[in-house]
Amino acid sequence: MSKNFLNKAWEKWNPGEIDTTTNITHNNFKKSDQVSNFSNTFTAEQNNDNLNNIKKNGYEDGFKRGKKEGFEAGFKKSFAEFEKKNREILNKMEDFLSNFRQSLSLFDEKVSSKIINTVLKISKKVLETTTLANDDSSFLKKIETIFQDRMFSLENPKLFISPNNQLLVKKYFGKIFSQYGWTICYNHYIPSGEFIISSGDTILDSTSSTRWNKLCKLVYFQEKQ
């Protein structure tokens, strides 16, 4: 090494004079890139999570709605079947009650006619036997006495029905028939929904075949006249 180099005056070196702009900018650029990439990645993941939540919530809402609609549809179907089944029973009951009410009215007419005929016979007997035929009070007392001795009511009333109506009649009308002393009987020859009432020596046949025969006889009798 030469003496000139050693003898050369040393220049003062200051570390602050180093130009670090390029490195700092480069480093800052890298850090900014990393932050941006992280931010983009976080946003994408957040969007995916939101999308998954939307799908999940949509699926749950759809499942609940479908379950509710399915339940309502099933309930409506079951209720319609129940209503249809019970409507058939109600229709049978209404038909039975209508026929029974009509038959009882006819039966009452027969009983009333029988009572009137009995009253006429009693009146005739009283008029023939009493010495006081013109005494109204005596006449009424004798009729009252005779009426007290004889009970004008249904004697052992019986209702004959088809075996097909056995369960229906027993279930809905068994108690009331039993309460009023009616006996329910079954006959295979009686069509379903029709019946025969008997009491003492009075019989009321409300079957369609009997009504048809009576109608034919009535028409035949009118044609003969």
UniProtKB/Swiss-Prot annotation:
Pfam families assigned to the protein according to its UniProt record, in alphabetical order: FliH (PF02108)
Keywords from the UniProt entry: Bacterial flagellum biogenesis, Bacterial flagellum protein export, Cytoplasm, Protein transport, Transport
Gene Ontology cellular-component terms listed: bacterial-type flagellum; cytosol
Molecular functions per Gene Ontology: cytoskeletal motor activity
A biological-process GO annotation: protein transport
InterPro entries: Flag_FliH (IPR000563), Flagellar_FliH/T3SS_HrpE (IPR018035), T3SS_Stator/FliH (IPR051472)
Keyword Transport: yes
Principal location listed in the UniProt entry: cytoplasm
Domain of life: Bacteria
Subcellular location: Cytoplasm
Family: Belongs to the FliH family.
Role this protein plays: Needed for flagellar regrowth and assembly.
Descriptive protein name: Flagellar assembly protein FliH
Species in which this protein is naturally found: Buchnera aphidicola subsp. Baizongia pistaciae (strain Bp)
